[in-house]
Structures are given as structure tokens and as C-alpha cells.
Amino acid sequence: MKLLLRGHDDRYAVEQLQLALFPEEPMEPVAEPFSGDGAVSSLHTGAVWLTATAEITLHGKTGRSRRRLRTAEADVPTRRRLLQNTYYEAAMCLREPPAWGSLSGVRPTKLTTRALLEGRTPTEAEKLLRTRYHVSPERSRLCVEASEATVQAAQLLRPQDVSVYVGIPFCPTRCAYCSFVSSSIERFSGLLEPYLDALVREIAHTGDLLRASGRTVRTLYIGVGTPTTLSAAQLRRLMEALRTHIDLTELVEYTVEGGRPDTLDAEKLETIASMGCGRMSINPQTMNDAVLARVGRRHTAAQTVAAYEAARAAGYDAVNMDLIAGLPGDDPKSFADSLRQVLALDPENVTVHTLALKKGADLYAGRMELPSADDVAQMLAGAETSLRAAGYTPYYLYRQKYMSGSFENIGWCRPGTAGLYNIYMMEEMHSIVSLGGGAMTKINLPDGRLERFHNPKFPQQYLERIDDVLAQKDAAFRLL
């Protein structure tokens, strides 16, 4: 769909909304008037009034909208909201209202969290989403519930606190839906030991910086690809380095993303637990063996159950399990059965993701038929009903671009078991110091901005540029 801007250059605000509302229409920015299908977003700045108009033509039908506000009241966020609401209203002449209304960002809970922290009631925060951003009552409720968990988690934070993330960008094989930069052990097993050598250097260097800056580590998360691709001995080496070089005495949460059940055995799970980790994530994605095979996950539902039982025997305080709605070959009945099997295991956390088709994933090429948006909506609605009935509540929520049906990912927890790192990271509540290939350190600045520092994505690049990685850590800590 063509997009022409007149009187403003806030292309990002309008483009993101257009992608969310018309995901099946290819985006084509233009600089000149056009005929046929497309959208025009205009802004006229007068002495008294700031007037936004939008006109969208699609398949021979046209939707129009016009809004205005006083020029003196038009700061940048208000102007952006004016443009988006005008575009949204024009679009609603051509399609049914989406559940997320005019919101196009990945962190809708930031709005409700801010409202609660400013002293608004949950009812007032819900009303904000419904009236200002056209969000459905159901999604507004989910946002507020997740934000209430965020407010509770914020009470555990102190000004000197940070979280530490450690990335292990290796997996047994690549799943068809995955776009993470992760190297298959089948091809790159020779890089594991050199990668650990470099990572231990970064850990030691970061430990020195943490001590010098007076920062304390509140949560620690080991993730990215499949950390349990490492052997038990390699996991012990990694976690011993963390314990040796970084002060973990004030840690309130330690998580390892076990991920693929076929990489987990009793020895690894016992090793990880013995090193102080209390949270383990075991991610079946589905309990349907045929769907698992179709997306390239070389494990079975039975292996998931075995890994879970081994984790329980190892004594973890909390176990999370992930499911994905919208996988090829899945349907509402099969998805409901997967959730039923997961709930029968009684994990503390269940995270329900919606399939997001990203350019790096094999599924993006479109060679597999996917469930319809209606089927995915049925999966998610059924999951919410079942999880609430089992005593779970939402504790974090985020959206992704290119997600099936423009839905969301939701972390559900039993009382008192919310994943703190997930909240702190997703809500950007404090600085995240990240180590390893593909890791991104985020420094929260006093003025509310974030400064990002990216490590090289691929393991080989990370090895070759480890000196640059350490120098970049120095630069990041100068901002802390």
C-alpha cells in the first residue's frame, strides 16, 4: 500500500500503524501524489489549530478522518497520537476494529504501568487504553493485570541494581519459526570451547566494572539460543565463572533457559541447580509430536515430560514452560490438548507465545500453511480461560511485529512466582548488562532515554572482536 505524508515527516508513527492494520498490504512510501490504492496522512499547522487528516483507499473503497487540537497543546507525543488516531479512524471505515486498537508498539503495558505508578486506579488505567487508544476491554484488562505485577516487581528494585543477561547462541538444530542468530551444533560444535574462553573474559571484565561502579546484580538470566546445548562440564565452567567474578550475594532470581527438552538430562539439571540457579525454562512449544516434527524440533512430548520430572527432582523453585499458538499443522483442538498436558505437570509459569513470522525464519518463505487468524484467536482465548481456571494470572505481556493476527505473548504465573527478569527487561525498568554473542546491553539514562550497546551477532565474530567487546563494556559503564 502506498503511503504519502503531507505537512509532517513522522513516517514511523504512521507506517507502524499501517503495518499493524493492513499487514497483508506491502508498504510503499511515495513522495508524489498517486492514484489507486494507498493512504495519505496530512498535518496542517495553523496559528490556533493543528489539523490532521487521513484518507485511505483500498480495493475501491475510501475511508476518511479529520481531527484537530490546539497548536499550543501539541507536543511531540500528542502530535503523534493525533496522526495515529486520525489514521486509525480512517482505517476503521475499511476493516473491523483490531483488539489492540491504534497501538502498534511492542510494549503496550508501559502505558498502564505508568498510569498505575502515577496513582491512577486499575479501572482508570483500563479506561485510558479503551478511550485514547481504542483497545478492546479484554486486552485492556490483560495489560492492567500485567502492569499490577510490574508495580509489585518494581518494589524490589534499588537505585544501584542491574540485571545481567548471558547469551549462548548455539542450538542443537534450527527450528523453522526461529529468527534468532543461533548456530547449529551440528555445524559449529568446534566453536563452543573458544566461545566459552571469550565469554569468561567478558564475565571477568564485567565483574570488575560492576564492583568499581558500585552496582549490584538483582537478576541473572542465561539464554538466547539453547544454553543447555553446552555439556554439564561446560555449564559448570560458565556458572563457576559467573559466581567467581560477579558478586551474586544480592541476587533475587537466577534463571537458565533450558529450552529444548532434548538437551536436558538429570546431570545437566543437577549441575545447574547446584550452582545456585532456582528457575528453569523447559519449552515444548507444542505437545503434538507431528507439529514438533514439522517445525524441525527433534524431540517428543515424552521427552518434555521426562525433562520436567528431572527438573523437579533437581529441586528448582520454579519451572516455566512455553507454548506457541499458530504453528503449522496445529489447530485449536491440538493446541488446547498441548496446554492441558502442560497444566497437568503443574509448572509455576506458562508462557503463551503467538507465532511471529520474521525474515530470518525458514517459515517466512511461506512454504507451510499456517492456522488462520481466527484459529489463533480461538487458541489464545481458550488458553486464557484454562490458565485462569487453573489459578494463573498474567505477569508480563508484549507484542511483536509480523505476529500472527497481531496478537501478543503473555507470561502467566501462579501467585508469587512471576519471572522478575522478564518484567525488568520487557518494561525497561533498569539497566540490563548483557554478555555474549548477539547480546545487547541497555543502559537506562537519568533523562529516561536508553543507550544500547550491541555485541557482535555471530560466535566467530564475537571471538575475533572480543577486545572491542570489552572496550564497549567500558563505554557502557561510564554511563552507569
Name these PLM-found stretches:
Residues 1-120, 199, 415-480:
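Radical SAM enzyme core and accessory elements
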Residues 10, 145-146, 214, 256:
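Key residue(s) within conserved catalytic/signature motifs
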Residues 29-40, 360-435:
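A C-terminal junction/extension of Radical SAM enzymes
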Residues 52-54, 166, 280-282:
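Short beta-strand motif preference
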Residues 90-97, 117-164, 213:
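N-terminal [4Fe-4S]-dependent radical SAM core
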Residues 161-196:
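Canonical Radical SAM [4Fe-4S] cluster-binding loop centered on the CxxxCxxC motif
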Residues 167, 281, 349-353, 423, ...:
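Beta-strand scaffold of nucleotide-dependent catalytic cores
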Residues 182-383:
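Conserved non-cysteine loop/helix-boundary elements of the Radical SAM core domain that shape
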